Amino acid sequence: CIKQILQIITILPDLASGGTEVLSSTFLDESPSISPNGIMVIYSSTKGTSKVLQLVSADGRFKANLPGAGGQFKFPAWSPYLTK
């Protein structure tokens, strides 16, 4: 279960224990989208005056900035990998 409190993305891995894992560290993170296999979360974040995409594993061990060609990134979503 994912919930967003003050735009800080958290994961609740064990609803019985209520334990949480903080996956982002600013109030400028929003629009999380969980991968179909539940392993990764992609979300938009603000860096300076631009929106960027951030990728983080559900356990918080892996974090990456996804490069873009500029512009504003909002509402990321997962889609199937297509080959020609």
UniProtKB/Swiss-Prot annotation:
Primary residence: periplasm
Function: Part of the Tol-Pal system, which plays a role in outer membrane invagination during cell division and is important for maintaining outer membrane integrity.
Keyword Protein biosynthesis in annotation: no
Species for this entry: Actinobacillus pleuropneumoniae
InterPro entries per UniProt: 6-blade_b-propeller_TolB-like (IPR011042), PD40 (IPR011659)
Family label: Belongs to the TolB family.
Subcellular location: Periplasm
Assembly description: The Tol-Pal system is composed of five core proteins: the inner membrane proteins TolA, TolQ and TolR, the periplasmic protein TolB and the outer membrane protein Pal. They form a network linking the inner and outer membranes and the peptidoglycan layer.
Name the record gives this protein: Tol-Pal system protein TolB
Keyword field: Cell cycle, Cell division, Periplasm
